[in-house]
């Protein structure tokens, strides 16, 4: 029987309330804490950023996932790239990514960020932000709905929970 994302949290809460304590591996606790305390930094470049703002509004309530939008890359661990990435903007994207705290994740939002979108054949457009930074989750759509973004964030939370240990690339640590 497979459990959904929220059923796992419910089972965890039941175990703590029944026993008063929890037996687990440190990797599971760290993964759970990281997944439920994402601090995203927005990199809104086009119309997808409007949908991202809508997802952060009270109707969708992204705060329930433990997310707190941060204005600085040094305070964030998730970058949401939303919109058309141009060749002139690509070095800035990489610079901001390099300034983020480790561990860090990237969510690519919309057709333009995923693969160039409508402007794919333009000389000035990067054909996907994954050519500049490593991307963990792709959210399709033009523009993607707020529900699609929230689903992508839930997929990222599942991925973070599966990550174990403190294995970091030496190039990521400053």
Curated annotation (Swiss-Prot):
Q: Which UniProt keywords apply?
A: 4Fe-4S, Cell inner membrane, Cell membrane, Iron, Iron-sulfur, Membrane, Metal-binding, NAD, Quinone, Translocase, Transport, Ubiquinone
Q: State its location(s).
A: Cell inner membrane
| Alphabetical list of Gene3D superfamilies matching this protein | 3.40.50.12280
Q: Name one GO cellular component term.
A: respiratory chain complex I
Give the EC number.
7.1.1.-
> Entry cofactor note text?
Binds 1 [4Fe-4S] cluster.
Report the InterPro entries cross-referenced here. NADH_UbQ_OxRdtase-like_20kDa, NADH_UQ_OxRdtase_20Kd_su
Q: List each coiled-coil range.
A: none
Reactions this protein catalyses: a quinone + NADH + 5 H(+)(in) = a quinol + NAD(+) + 4 H(+)(out)
**UniProt keyword Membrane, yes or no:** yes
Q: Which Pfam families match?
A: Oxidored_q6
Q: Which Gene Ontology BP terms does the record give?
A: aerobic respiration; electron transport coupled proton transport
Which cofactor does the UniProt annotation name? Answer: [4Fe-4S] cluster
- Give GO terms: molecular function aspect only: 4 iron, 4 sulfur cluster binding; iron ion binding; NADH dehydrogenase (ubiquinone) activity; NADH:ubiquinone reductase (non-electrogenic) activity; quinone binding
Function of the protein: NDH-1 shuttles electrons from NADH, via FMN and iron-sulfur (Fe-S) centers, to quinones in the respiratory chain. Couples the redox reaction to proton translocation (for every two electrons transferred, four hydrogen ions are translocated across the cytoplasmic membrane), and thus conserves the redox energy in a proton gradient.
This protein's assembly is summarised as:
NDH-1 is composed of 14 different subunits. Subunits NuoB, C, D, E, F, and G constitute the peripheral sector of the complex.
Q: Which NCBIfam families does the protein's record reference?
A: nuoB_fam (TIGR01957), PRK06411.1 (NF005012)
Q: What is this protein called?
A: NADH-quinone oxidoreductase subunit B
What species was this sequence derived from?
Answer: Rickettsia akari (strain Hartford)
């Amino acid at each position: 029987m497979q459990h959904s994302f929220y059923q796992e949290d419910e089972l965890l809460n039941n175990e703590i309330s029944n026993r008063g304590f929890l037996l687990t591996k440190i990797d599971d606790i760290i993964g759970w804490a990281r997944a439920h305390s994402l601090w995203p930094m927005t990199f809104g470049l086009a119309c997808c950023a409007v949908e991202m703002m809508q997802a952060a509004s009270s109707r969708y309530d992204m705060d329930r996932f433990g997310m707190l939008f941060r204005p600085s890359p040094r305070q964030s661990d998730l970058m949401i790239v939303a919109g058309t990435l141009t060749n002139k903007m690509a070095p800035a994207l990489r610079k901001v990514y390099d300034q983020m705290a480790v561990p860090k994740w990237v969510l690519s939002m919309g057709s333009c960020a995923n693969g160039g979108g409508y402007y794919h054949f333009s000389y000035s457009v990067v054909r996907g932000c994954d050519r500049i930074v490593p991307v963990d989750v792709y959210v399709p759509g033009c523009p993607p709905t707020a529900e699609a973004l929230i689903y992508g964030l839930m997929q990222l939370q599942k991925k973070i929970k599966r990550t174990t240990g403190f294995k970091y690339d030496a190039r990521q640590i400053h």
